Amino acid sequence: FRIYVFDTKNIPDLLTKFLRVRKEFIGPNQPRNLLPMSKELEMATTICSNSFKTFKAGSYYLPENSNDFQLCWVSGMINTYPMLALNNEKERNRVSAELDFVVNKLQGKSGYFYGGITANGELRPEKMYPDFPALQAMVRKNSDALLWLIKHFMLLKAQGYSSMIKPEWENAAKKLAAAFSKTWHQHGEFGQYIVPETGEIAVFNSTAGAIAPAGLAIAADYFKHPEWLQVAKDAANYYYKKDVVMQGLTGGHSGDISMDADADSGLGFLESLMALYYYTNDKTWLQKAEVQAALCASWTLSYDAVFPASSQIGKLQSKMAGAVWASIQNKHAAPGICTASGDYLFKLYRATGNQLYADLIRDIQHAHAEAVNIPPHHITTNNLVGSSMERIQPSDAEGEESVGNYINTRNSWTETNGMLMSLELPGIYVQTDKGQFYTFDHILVSLLNKKQKSVVLRLTNATAYDATVSIFAETSAEAKNPIPVAAFVHWPTVNIPSGETVKVQVNNRGKIKLLK
């Protein structure tokens, strides 16, 4: 082992130091190119498409291994986003039906949403405080809901289907943003649990509202309501000082762990800080985001753990650097972020040029791919083809027999974050004027030629699957400008059959051309 001794002024300095040295002892990890992101998207969207059902309550993609519906957090009305991104009429109409269902069945009088509903149409309570009998909902779920509702609207606009955005959906998003604003002005925080009927806070404290500033910032821009942006800034400053600067941890984001420290809230708060940078162009948010990214890295495996040779992960020789520890209670890691692509880490890399942020989200994506069930040669969940589940267990916290072994089940949220990473992260990011690139997808890339206005890249697909790889190219000057929410819609792609190599010219306008 190695001990680092250094002077530090505060917790943010400690966190940023940790980010710089977290891989120094063992050196860089070696992620495997196993599963192209396009293949993962294909398999996971097939699972999700087959899960669309109609019940007495309404029509929706199942977010759990039951027929009941749970809003956001573990994928409800988040798994709709990659299905909408497929840009076909069948899934577009299904997504529309689910948004109708959510807006009509789950929104309370206050503007906040209830956390779930049974297939038979009965509202589902959260894990409630017994001395507070009113039906409550997680603030975290409502924070997700505001962000993802408007992301759906922006994706429809980017696809050319703005006419499909219903006034009822927009009104629901407005009411939710207004509810958050009202709560903030009344209490100076968002709390952890709220009462959708009245808007009353049932349980105070925690960082359960970590994603709320992102939702409010995007809502302020979409609806041209600047007051919500001010609330977003005030709330983000509050949480940053209270939880990041003063404690070096965030919590309260998961429904099963009370207010324990967790990764979800930390990563969700990074989403908010990057959203505020996007909508204000104020670099103080970027500075806060760098500290927050360092905190997020502390929840992520920095090395390829050695698993028992007889375990499932050991037999597969999986490289698990990038697995994300969910919380201090769960005592295991998971494939990916609950529930997001983590594209804010890519955006932070793009804005700062610090490759450590790109390495972090690349590790997360590649560890996720290792957990995907791909029979007959890469079996993890013993479940559906393309499925994954939430346990990557490098410790004996659940018993020695659990180390390196999966559980025979699947989780929609892990499959959903895999879909989101496949969409919202570019396969290759290129700065043409510098001749620099970074590869997120599971291919090998080398620079063959650099000219003033273009580069030529060699792309090799050594995996067992054909790959469709997105390329996001720009100049270093353009990288100073934030990119829109649904930017991936406009990224060109190149097809690379399994085992083959192609050459592609990428110009400074982001256009690509296959070369012989």
Residue spans for each PLM region:
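Well-ordered alpha-helical scaffold segments within catalytic/enzyme domains
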Residues: 5, 76-92, 144-165, 211-226, ...
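Long, well-ordered core segments of solenoidal/helical folds
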Residues: 22-29, 33-63, 93-114, 167-190, ...
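Soluble or luminal CAZymes and related metallo-dependent hydrolases
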Residues: 75, 94, 137, 141-144, ...
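Active-site lining segments of carbohydrate-active enzymes
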Residues: 126-133, 154-226, 240-241, 278, ...
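A domain-scale signal for long, ordered structural cores in large, multidomain proteins
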Residues: 202-213, 217-221, 226-235, 239-251, ...
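Terminal, non-catalytic domain-edge segments
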Residues: 9-50, 159, 275, 279, ...
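Carbohydrate-recognition beta-sandwich/jelly-roll modules
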Residues: 1-179, 473-475, 482-516
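Carbohydrate-binding/catalytic loop surfaces
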Residues: 49-71, 113-139, 187-211, 248-272, ...
